[in-house]
Amino acid sequence: LHPNDEKRIIRALEVYQATGKTITQHDRESRAIPDRYAPLTIALNFRERPWLWERIDRRVDQMMAQGLEGEVRGLLAQGIPSTCTAMQAIGYKELAAAILTGRPVREGAEEVKLRSRQYAKRQLTWFRRNKEAHWIEWEREPDFSAAVQDSTRLVHASGLQ
């Protein structure tokens, strides 16, 4: 562990306090346990990327309409520092920064949209690297019923129960 990696140091101390083992021992022992289940990765993708971005934008607008700004303001008013791990989540971090610097909250919301799109892109890239992932592709509107049927078919075809 790097001495400046506060989050991992805290996690290592939590593991030691809970188990009496160092994080290295815990990780080594965890890897030595044989997997009881074979993983089956099912990934969902929209072929039309701009449509995914529109869905993300609509979701952020919905979160704002449901009171995300008030929630962030409330947490800050309670003295929760903006550097707290929970306040680093997408949405909280950007709105807290806008509020604390006096920028318009609307700018913070636009930044939430940008960060959410960047995160979605990283997720898709991560899944694409998994050569064993089974992809369910949507043109535009998600067809959840078809996705459930496709997923069920993949599970049965893989031999999983």
For the regions a protein language model found, what residue spans apply to each?
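Phosphate/Mg2+-binding loops and adjacent switch elements
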Residues: 1-39
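Catalytic core of IPPT-family isopentenyl/dimethylallyl transferases
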Residues: 32-161
